[in-house]
């Protein structure tokens, strides 16, 4: 509409239904913009739905031709990405201000056990035990570089004085070169089983050694999952 022609937009990747994204990256091919970048962003945000906001725009990097002179592909929002980072939010205190973006559990979890279990995720492994059936990935091998649980204080609690005890809010962070369909939600569901004491810390490693999706924990709600960063 703003450019006067149909534009094909390509995103950094797909997420499960109900999952949120911050700092999501996409690209499109176009002639030079007819507006200043800030004005273009303003006009875009004026016509986009309230649930979508554009924060920046810039020209994609020029492709670097290899020293051997072989073909170098243009920059691509999805295929040029080298890492993706997700966050999953859980709270243990009833909180109507965060309900839309965090999963409320009535009983606390053992973060120390869950963090020790995270060690099995680090490195290059077959994560098919956490992949939802029907995925069309050519391989289930992913390389995880970070996985951890930690407590945090949400903004409304620190700024507005909403009651908040130590450990009432926790977040899981995981970063990898790629992810399988439903992978993060299945990992979190399995971690919760460990945090509740229903499974040993070694369970994650055992699942990855030969378990199937039906052996792992349940898929947790998508509303509390955020694609938070795409690395290039």
Placement of each model-derived feature along the sequence:
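Structured-RNA-binding interfaces characteristic of tRNA pseudouridine synthases
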Residues: 1-232
């Amino acid at each position: 509409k703003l450019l006067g022609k149909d534009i094909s937009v390509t995103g950094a990747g797909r997420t499960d239904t109900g999952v949120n994204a911050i700092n999501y990256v996409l690209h499109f091919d176009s002639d030079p913009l007819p507006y200043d970048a800030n004005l273009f962003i303003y006009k875009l945000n004026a016509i986009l739905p309230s649930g979508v906001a554009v924060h920046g725009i810039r020209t994609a990097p020029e492709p670097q031709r290899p020293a051997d002179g072989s073909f170098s592909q243009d920059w691509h929002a999805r295929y040029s990405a080298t890492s993706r980072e997700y966050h999953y939010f859980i709270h243990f205190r009833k909180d109507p201000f965060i309900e839309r973006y965090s999963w409320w559990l009535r009983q606390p979890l053992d973060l120390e056990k869950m963090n020790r279990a995270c060690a099995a995720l680090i490195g290059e492994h077959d994560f098919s035990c956490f992949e939802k059936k029907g995925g069309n990935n050519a391989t289930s091998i992913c390389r995880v570089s970070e996985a951890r649980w930690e407590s945090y204080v949400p903004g409304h609690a620190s700024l507005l004085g909403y009651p908040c005890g130590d450990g009432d809010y926790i977040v899981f962070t995981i970063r990898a070169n790629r992810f399988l369909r439903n992978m993060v939600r299945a990992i979190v569901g399995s971690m919760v089983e460990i945090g509740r004491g229903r499974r040993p810390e070694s369970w994650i490693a055992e699942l990855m050694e030969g378990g199937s999706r039906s052996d792992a924990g349940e898929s947790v709600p998508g509303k509390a999952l955020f694609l938070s960063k795409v690395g290039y």
